[in-house]
């Protein structure tokens, strides 16, 4: 079979690739691929391998997702091979009509990256249509008087094919009276005319039947036939004659129905009824109407240039005798700008990434205007200020691409309006709008609402309580804007961080894992991070400083005097002759809190003799308020309370035992009668003390024996005289509880003589000793502790002399309140430096005071009767100076210079004191 019988599978397919380079500013290379195929190819037929022609490999096809974008689905692309396949019937006559060239243009779309490729498939005509007449038979009346050579226009056949496959010629069945003449119109179409070869005789043959055949130029040619019936009429000498054989006129397509197109006119030289001419269309017209009397042709319907550009009609003029004349009327329709351009989007991206680079392809725009000429020339523009632009890709085809940076956080979507305007007069335009949504990318890091955070948390907070909350916002969407919180770093120990704080990843709330202690941890800093869930994730850090607020959770601690298990201190001795204002002792306390919570005040809760003593509210100094009366008891008891400034205040109490006496002998009964405080670990300590005592006794016996043997050999009698009966004191230092552990920021360790456990050994000194001779008992530090006094003292071994005024403190050197002392109570210490060893020895020696005239309380020049007293009250902000913790008991004694001056007054002699004591003994 030939091409006309459907051998479409073997038709040639000639793919031709054309590459059209756009300007350098075009972001992509636009390729146009041309194919040529015959019409009526069966579905599934291969047009060509589109992937190969585009340079795609088979491996790329799954990712590139090559597909066809067109208004009608004539073609499709195989996802496996990339071949362009026929998907619907291709009828050239239906698609293009009588156009000499028929091509289907569409776009091939490839993704990753997105690009468009123009494809042109030319549809070749095949001889699949036969010429057809509108009717199977036609009737024609010819007068017997018609002269040979007279021509009659016959019905034309229609062939939908073009070119050689269209109608090419006509054939007429053989008849000696008629012949066939073929003529051609201006558009190239052919029509037949019947020519009379000889005169007809109606009396011989009144009816003729002829067969008219129309043939195309196909191979083999196709044909169509119609029967021509000729009726011979009676003679009419003069037939009608038209003014012109062909009437041509141009008509605008926008004329309304009823518009007069033209008027045909014919004349007949006959008279009477034979000269009356009536006009009619040779073929029935539907668009135009003809006035049979006047020959006026008018429009019957609205004309449309886009449907039919030209009309050709045959008008007959028939006289009353039956003679007929024919003329041709050709009406050319002029195009008017009556069609607005049509704008359509193809392969529009639903979402555009906000980080798309300028020039990213968004959509393909197709412009179509049914008008022709300038009326069909269209200009496309983008309305408004948007970060997009349109680029001409081919005729009536544009690309919509990005023309700037996109930011979804500022503009999440764009309403893009594209206007197409033709060049008609007046120009027509149409617009189409589309909303382009911007897809979010993780381009915004979380931002904290504050540059840094500072919170205050009171101590002793409940574990698990929230102490702070941070908040960060992320302008992105979805996971890109979902923020989680964590602790990145801190100034705490890494291992201890988890035991202090934790953080909620969702809410940003920071929780305390434990109760904070202001005395252990006053402040700490955390580095918090907010991180989104994007890929890659973005984060931001912020510092959170936590200040632990102090609460009054620590009661004052009494450091001095050292308290026993029952809360009472050992006795302090006050001279009977003490004047009002005499400094008896000083209560020293500290508070581990700070601020007002550590501001201590001292109060007397109970006194055995009210009004006898006064207590400094802030200094804690216990002074005599008046002189001792005859009715006043020698032993006094003061219950002192130390309160802090917290709300509510916390307090501690201390019981002071004060004894008015001038010598230790007066208070010995009180000392021996006083019960020894019980020790919780007395049993264990007892065994330890016994063991140590045995070892010490054995060692001392060995040393004494060695010294005695050596002195036996010595010739110095003075050395032996020291071992004569006299006064020797053995005392053991007692260390109060250690306050270095706990919540105090500073440690206070005191070493004082525990007078309750002091032992006295009375030895009789040798009378051979000179009054100026003293035994030096001490270490290399130079501290002098005389055990044997001058001969003057031996005359009254049982008397206690009052302390020497040379050892009294000056007003400027008295201990006072730290931090907030009055100007008159503030003084500086002497410039001479005391070694640590000397002070320790002085403190230990203060517990050993002689009971007779040779005791350290006498008025001898070498006397150093010392008792440890803690210095001024200290708060947590001051570190105590150990030099302030020593003063002379029994009086306001102060260390003086060699001249013995104290505050501008001459010191009282020691001998006078001794005489006064002697008088008391005599009484």
From Swiss-Prot:
SMART domains associated with the record: CA
Any GO molecular function: calcium ion binding
A GO CC term attached to the entry: plasma membrane
Entry keyword Glycoprotein: yes
Residue intervals on the Cytoplasmic side: 709-923
Leader peptide range in chain numbering: 1-30
Alphabetic keyword roster: Calcium, Cell adhesion, Cell membrane, Glycoprotein, Membrane, Repeat, Signal, Transmembrane, Transmembrane helix
UniProt xrefs under PROSITE patterns: CADHERIN_1, CADHERIN_2
Keyword Membrane: yes
Start-end of Basic residues biased regions: 913-923
Location(s) in or outside the cell: Cell membrane
InterPro entries: Cadherin-like_dom, Cadherin-like_sf, Cadherin_C, Cadherin_CBD, Cadherin_CS, Cadherin_N, Protocadherin/Cadherin-CA
Glycan-linked positions: 415, 541
Region (Disordered): 794-832, 893-923
Biased composition (Polar residues): 807-832
GO terms of biological process kind: cell adhesion; homophilic cell adhesion via plasma membrane adhesion molecules; nervous system development
Free-text function comment from the UniProt entry: Potential calcium-dependent cell-adhesion protein. May be involved in the establishment and maintenance of specific neuronal connections in the brain.
Name assigned to this protein: Protocadherin gamma-B5
Source organism of this protein record: Pan troglodytes (Chimpanzee)
Lineage: Eukaryota, Metazoa, Chordata, Craniata, Vertebrata
